[in-house]
Amino acid sequence: ITCGQVTSQVAGCLSYLQRGGAPAPXXXXGIRNLXXMA
């Protein structure tokens, strides 16, 4: 997995990581994609 792949997959989670609250659906999908790539 490259840094670029990680960045693109977690980009949807940035607002959740910065502000908290509920993660966006894109964040959950991106994390699942990373787990599948690993």
Curated annotation (Swiss-Prot):
Keyword terms, alphabetized: Antibiotic, Antimicrobial, Fungicide
Signal peptide: none
UniProt keyword tRNA processing, yes or no: no
Keyword NADP found: no
Gene Ontology BP terms: defense response to bacterium; defense response to fungus; killing of cells of another organism; xenobiotic metabolic process
Function: Possesses potent antifungal activity against F.graminearum but not P.infestans.
Note: Under low salt conditions, possesses potent antifungal activity but activity is drastically reduced under high salt conditions.
Similarity remark: Belongs to the plant LTP family.
Name listed for the protein in its UniProt record: Antifungal protein 5
Organism listed in the record: Malva parviflora
